[in-house]
From Swiss-Prot:
Cross-link (Glycyl lysine isopeptide (Lys-Gly) (interchain with G-Cter in ubiquitin)): 5, 26, 30, 39, 47, 57
Lipidation (S-palmitoyl cysteine): 133, 143, 156
Protein known as: Caveolin-1
Annotated segments matching region Interacts with SPRY1, SPRY2, and SPRY4: 149-160
Localization annotation: Golgi apparatus membrane; Cell membrane; Membrane, Caveola; Membrane raft
Region Interacts with SPRY1, SPRY2, SPRY3 and SPRY4, residue ranges: 131-142, 167-178
GO terms of molecular function: molecular adaptor activity; oxysterol binding; protein kinase binding; transmembrane transporter binding
Modified residues (Phosphotyrosine): 6, 14, 25
Domain of life assignment: Eukaryota
Modified residues annotated as N6-acetyllysine in this record: 5
Membrane protein topology class: Peripheral membrane protein
Organism: Muntiacus reevesi (Reeves' muntjac)
Length: 178
């Protein structure tokens, strides 16, 4: 080690000596190196999405599962021709399917943009305005709570204790006369 420089066993030059166990970028410890290689960092913005199960948290289980049978039904004794019923079923199902896809194609990205902006603003306000205001309020209210506590213990406690003692001596006897 000369002039504040350090060369490790692999010939890498460092300005500051490396500790025996290494550092976070180049650990000497084999267990530490394996531990760092095992950790996988996931980024919420680049995670893979499931294209099969698009509602993994079941947000829309009771809302949008509307099939032909949920909307149109013919009671017993009032049936249309079988061909009409089949064509109606196919028309309803295909129209719902493709019209949803068309609306998703036209408005899906703009709505995602709008909702993304909305929730970003909501998160920003919660993090930078709501929580600090609540914390500030709780800090400021502490002095008021101390004054209030002193007031209650000084004036209200003796008053209500005296009133309680007065009313504790009242006795009621009820007799039923025939």
């Amino acid at each position: 080690m000369s002039g504040g420089k350090y060369v490790d066993s692999e010939g890498h030059l460092y300005t500051v000596p490396v500790r025996e166990q290494g550092n976070i970028y180049k650990p000497n410890n084999k267990a530490m190196a394996e531990e760092m290689n095992e950790k996988q960092v996931y980024d919420a913005h680049t995670k893979e999405i499931d294209l099969v199960n698009r509602d993994p948290k079941h947000l829309n289980d009771d809302v949008v599962k509307i099939d032909f049978e949920d909307v149109i039904a013919e009671p017993e004794g009032t049936h249309s021709f079988d061909g009409i019923w089949k064509a109606s079923f196919t028309t309803f199902t295909v129209t719902k399917y493709w019209f949803y896809r068309l609306l998703s194609a036209l408005f899906g990205i703009p709505m995602a943009l709008i909702w993304g902006i909305y929730f970003a603003i909501l998160s920003f306000l919660h993090i930078w305005a709501v929580v600090p205001c609540i914390k500030s309020f709780l800090i400021e209210i502490q002095c008021i709570s101390r004054v209030y506590s002193i007031y209650v213990h000084t004036f209200c406690d003796p008053l209500f204790e005296a009133i309680g003692k007065i009313f504790s001596n009242i006795r009621i006897n009820m007799q039923k006369e025939i």
